[in-house]
Each structure stands twice: as C-alpha cells, then as structure tokens.
Amino acid sequence: MTWRDNQSFPQPTLNTTGIPSVPVDLSSFSELLSRQAPELLPVNRVAYGTTPVGPTDAVPHGTTIVALKYPGGVLIAGDRRSTQGNMIAGRDVQKVYITDDYTATGIAGTAAIAVEFARLYAVELEHYEKLEGVPLTFRGKVNRLAIMVRGNLGAALQGFVALPLLVGYDLDDPHPEGAGRIVSFDAAGGWNIEEEGYQSVGSGSIFAKSSMKKLYSQVSDADSALKVAVEALYDAADDDSATGGPDLVRGIYPTAVTIGAEGAEEVPETRIAELAREVIESRSRTDTFGPDARRGIDARGDS
C-alpha cells in the first residue's frame, strides 16, 4: 500500500503541534476522506448520542437483493421498492450497482446510507487502482467493503442499518467455471463467502432464499439464473410487503447485473420484463389456493 511516509507500515510521527499522528493510507479513499472531510462519509450523516434502537421507520428502507452463481459467472438482482414504515416511499429505487469491471453490489437497509455506500465503494476501488497501478484482488475488495460496513456500526446501533451483498468474478481463480463469488456481510463488518451458490439480504430474504433453494438446480447459465432470480423476487414480494414485485401497469421491473470473464454487464430491462411476464403468466395458470378455494369460487360464479 502507499503510505504517506513511504514505509511499509504506518508509524506514529510528530505533527507541527508535537502530537503523534499516524500516516494516512493514500490508497484508501474512504480513509483519506475520514481525515480530510469526515462529514461526507455515510456514517457521519447520522446524528450520534441517542440510545440504541431497532430499525427506524423515520427514513426510507430498501429491500430485497438476491444473488446466484452460474457456470462461468454470477448474477445479482434487486427489487425496486423502498418503504418508510407502513408506507411505500418509492417504486423505482436502484439497489444494484456495478462498482468496477468485475464486481457489483446490492444493498438493503437505510436507503440513503446504502446508496452512498455503493457509490463510495466504487470510488474506493477506482482510487486504489489509479494510485497503485493495479486493481485490488477480490479478497482485497471484500476487506475494503468490510471496513466500510464496520465504520457504520454506530449508525446501525441506532437503527440506520445498511447491509451489502457483494458479487464478483475472481480473476485469480484457476477454474473460470467456478470463479463467481457471492459475499454477505453483517452489521459489524464480518463477511462470509457463500458456498451454496445463492444468497439474499433484506426483509424478503427468507422467502427469496427459500425460493432459490428449490429452483437452483435449474441454473445452467446466465439466462436461467436470471429467471430464478425473478422467480425469487416474485415469491418474496408475495409474502413481504416491503418487497416490490414486477409492476406491469407502471412498467417497473427488477434490475440485475451479470458478471463473467468478459466483465460486469447490466441485464436489459426488456429481457427482465419478458421473464417477469412469463413468471406471472405461469403463476396465473397454477392453482395455488387448493381445491376447496376453487370450489368456493365456482359456487359464487367468479370463475
């Protein structure tokens, strides 16, 4: 790393006031920002001093994010709804971001902090590559994001939680077919590389993950992974009011990004819309209410 005093490790030095100071890691944009303009960090947008509380309804929250690995790559997708308490705060929120050529993030939780997390992380990766002349390894990218999440712990204890889901393609993996990576984080900055092949975060994650568990055997390429992701988000929206499903009336659909050996690429909205219509049509043909409910409908003459 590039330290201000050109040493391998930061050593305390005396500043002009005679007080020991620690050199700044210039390759880390977030650390540089914390020294030069700390008020711009997402964590410092929250006023401290209050007692810890649960997740707050005072600001919009975004959910749900899903990710799946497929042979030769990985896919991440997210719904578009944000909620504020029991109200819908937004219907077309962008929750999935490409952060560099081979990584993308989707963040659930407090919307304002989550969006700034994603943007700051993208700048962090670009800043490192410009200063060092080489991109971070995938493990290095994970550690950088973990440090940023850990820095938000104080706000998280006040209810302003923002949890990312990181996906990427590991260029150092000797087996390209299995180079897709999914990494989940907790509020304290702990992280875990998912080995099952799929993961989800957000209020609808339990429903989305259950759906992916049943459908994951159908994943054979990027397109089949996208279909499973749309199915999972549809299932999450069916049971979680904070998750928005495909909105055919307004033309609002989930967003998705695929990452393979060629790099990260946003999935065209037209393809997602096509799959969403297929899922809705398939679900509409299926009797999901049981024979008793069907007999009741027929008796009323509603069929």
UniProtKB/Swiss-Prot annotation:
It comes from the Bacteria. It is found in: Cytoplasm. Transmembrane segments: none annotated. Residues 282-303 are annotated as: Disordered. GO terms for biological process: modification-dependent protein catabolic process; proteasomal protein catabolic process. Disruption phenotype: Cells lacking this gene are viable and grow at the wild-type rate, but show a large reduction in the rate of degradation of the pupylated substrates. Cells lacking the Pup-proteasome system (pup/prcS, prcA and prcB) completely lack pupylated proteins and intact proteasomes; they grow as well as wild-type during the exponential phase, but they show reduced survival after prolonged incubation at stationary phase (17 days after inoculation) and become hypersensitive to nitrogen limitation, and, to a lesser extent, to carbon limitation. The keyword Aminoacyl-tRNA synthetase does not apply. Gene3D superfamilies: Glutamine Phosphoribosylpyrophosphate, subunit 1, domain 1 (3.60.20.10). GO terms for molecular function: threonine-type endopeptidase activity. The 20S proteasome core is composed of 14 alpha and 14 beta subunits that assemble into four stacked heptameric rings, resulting in a barrel-shaped structure. The two inner rings, each composed of seven catalytic beta subunits, are sandwiched by two outer rings, each composed of seven alpha subunits. The catalytic chamber with the active sites is on the inside of the barrel. Has a gated structure, the ends of the cylinder being occluded by the N-termini of the alpha-subunits. Is capped by the proteasome-associated ATPase, ARC. This is Proteasome subunit beta. It comes from Mycolicibacterium smegmatis (strain ATCC 700084 / mc(2)155) (Mycobacterium smegmatis). The lineage of its organism: Bacteria, Bacillati, Actinomycetota, Actinomycetes, Mycobacteriales.
